[in-house]
Amino acid sequence: MGLLQDYSQRREEGEGRGSNFTRFSCWSCDFCRCLCNAEIAGESGGKVCCCGGKGGGPDQHSETRSCDNSGSWGRYGLAAFAPCSSLRLPAYLHLHEIQKIVIIFYATKIMGRHLTVFIIALAAVFAACAEEKEMAKSLTVKSAFENGGKIPAKYTCDGEDISPPLYIEGLREDVKSLVIICEDPDAPMGVFTHWIAWNVEPTSEIPENVPKTKFVDEPKMVQGRNDFGKVGYNGPCPPSGEHRYYFRIYAIDTLLQGDYSRQELLRAIEGHILQYGEIYGLYSRSR
């Protein structure tokens, strides 16, 4: 059982009374329709969504993962322990896309024992975060649907299941290649990858229906396996409810060597990203 989950269960069972801390639960954010798993108890403000809660939005949504017993996290990596009622956490800390791990621990008393806590936050990480925010504004991505609009069935498992067109505005001349990632952050078991491609030649338009082959000639790119276990694009096919599907474009300063999963691809481009842009669409299946 995860560290925070374990603390949460102890609290639910009546142990450690008087302590306030971040607990894990499942609730729906009315703002971005995300099923979030973070709840900040006590004076630190109640429920806070990973999209920013009261002030954030889908374009700022970042992922949180379950914490294991060592306190380590997956990518996006913000871990916040807020066990002391005298401490407050900010409603929103945005580390999305820099794939850095920042673990913030606060001092507390749990079941009569003091938990020593440390803040691990290198200045370079925060500098990278600021740079990332600026970079995120530099590309405009458009498609066959409006940002936040419904994805046409043509591009889903209920239709032709072909990739939608992507129009990219604002590319710099020194960009060497593009990376494409399409993912569903609302999947029941965590982020689900629908498409990854790298070494995409810099272009202002990626036409629809990219062939489902590893190597593509027009435009030139290399495609990896998605979470369906297939090469290339496979579209939205949510088991229930309305899901969000992000099409993320990274403009980088190099060509990549190797074969990658989504996580490996994100690690490979770290430190090489010149520009970034995204568009997301919504899709739910008729029952």
Swiss-Prot record:
Top-level division of the source organism's lineage: Archaea
Q: InterPro entries this protein is in?
A: PEBP, PEBP-like_sf, YbhB_YbcL/LppC-like
Q: Note the Gene3D superfamilies from the entry.
A: PEBP-like
| Pfam families found in the cross-reference section | PBP
Q: Which family does it belong to?
A: Belongs to the UPF0098 family.
Protein name as it appears in the record: UPF0098 protein AF_1698
